[in-house]
C-alpha cells in the first residue's frame, strides 16, 4: 500500500493540438495547444510540474482523450446526437466533421486512473486513450445507423444531420 498521497492532474489530449489522420499522442508529444481551453490546460500541466520540481509535491499528470458513457453532460457530441435523434431534431456537425477524436469509455478511464494511482511513478505523465479514433462525422453517422435499428419509424436518421460553421479554436 502506498504511504503518500499523489496529486493527479487530470488533463486533456487537446494540449497536444489536433490529432491527424494517422498516429496518436504519447508522453513524448510536444505541447501545441490551439484554443484558450487547451492553453489553460497546458498551463495547468506546467504549473503542476513546477510544484513537483520546486516543492517536491508528489504529482502525476494524466492526459486523456474524449470520454463517453453514462451521465455525460447532455451537450457533448454523443449524448446530444442521441437525444436530438430520439426527438427527431436536427443534429449539427461543426465544420466538415473531419475533426478526429479518440473515444474512451468512462469506466476504462477510471480503471486507468486507478492503475496510475497504484503503480504510477511520481512526476511522470501518462496518456490515457481508447484507441477509438474516429471523425466527428463518422461517429454521428454511426449513431444514426444504431438509431435506425431502434427507431425504425424515423429512419433514416442521417437525414437530420446538417453542417454548421466551425467554432473558433475547434481542433
Indicate residue ranges for each PLM-predicted region.
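Short, small-residue-biased leader/transition segments that mark boundaries at the very start
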Residues: 1-6, 136-139
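Activation loop
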Residues: 1-2, 12, 21, 77, ...
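SDR active-site strand-loop-helix element
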Residues: 7-13, 62-64
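Proline-centered turn/helix-capping motifs that create local helix->coil transitions or kinks
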Residues: 8, 17-21, 56, 72, ...
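PG/GG-rich flexible active-site loop of Rossmann-like NAD(P)H-dependent oxidoreductases
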Residues: 14, 66, 133
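Catalytic helix-loop patch of NAD(P)-dependent Rossmann-fold dehydrogenases
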Residues: 15-61, 68, 72-74
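Hydrophobic alpha-helix immediately C-terminal to the catalytic Tyr-X-X-X-Lys motif of short-chain
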Residues: 43, 47, 51, 81, ...
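C-terminal substrate-binding subdomain of Rossmann-fold SDR/epimerase-dehydratase oxidoreductases
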Residues: 79, 85-171
